[in-house]
């Protein structure tokens, strides 16, 4: 039986604490669209996305109005294009990206993900063509997002792919020089990428997924912060164990909301419901910040000593509460630390509290730590590859998802600001300890073997 206080607290979440469903993402398999004729492939892709996702925005809006819970982003994730369009050349891959962008605009969605490849153990010709197409594809489209998986606990780290992605990021930044390298904001490099991520830029539909499926990403950092603030105001002597329990209970409510909306949308569209991703996703709006949660837990700012421990507490409590609320939890399900997309985190970086090394340390206990990190425009491809390799190693050794979304901002140096607009926000450019110290190591290439604990059979 719900108490009056619980009902009122849920209403307060909706009214004043920015509770919403951050994204409803429809996965669409493109494998039945495959063929050797690029024009026919593009036609098949457009027709299938229209058929399955044509009413996605309308249905999400209707369900949101019915329950008073806004769905902020409506998105589509498709099969990895490097697989579905494996016989195509680089220019043909670019044309596929443009068709995806056109289709996304026609149906009114925010982003379309899946322009990516899975290369943790090596490349096919389709993989090489797609990765070569990424800079032009992202620079010439608005809604297309790309993700490339270069490592896994079972395969190790493909260092040739890591180096190639360092070069790709540089090229993508240069092609969008006038917009602070914004193409890189739509490109994510992964280790252990899940097949059901609803969040961009990592979303794609895995090969083991249904023909179509709804996956939901919840929100709620503002809700968690307010819950902690209320509890500490009522009882200043609460310890971290008690605060963890409060976060857990709040996460339960947030996840219940996400699953309710997701299932209603799936039923209305006539497709299966997949998972709820439990990641707390911030925005650049006041009161919707993951960074502010750390201050509510007693830290002066995110980035000071104790930050990684606080993040571990937060991540664990959110997972425990969310897992109890939903039978199907998936995606990344770990706190995001997107530097430019969170006002508080961006401010901490500009004040010097957040270094590259601290962000990397935080990644060991969350899913995406080097996220929307702006770097100096002269950062070399080898240095980018070294940063990516470090991030991949954390994921591979700890059997978890990690990712890097790095933005070398052309023409700007550490300490200057980069602005990406909208949900992508703005951030100070973070310094890197050395720009050329990784060159020899990265140029060796090859594959770093999988760790011994990958042998689990």
UniProtKB/Swiss-Prot annotation:
InterPro entries: UPF0210. Belongs to the UPF0210 family. It comes from the Bacteria. Homodimer. Gene3D superfamilies: 3.20.70.20. This is UPF0210 protein Sfum_2948. CDD domains: RNR_PFL_like_DUF711.
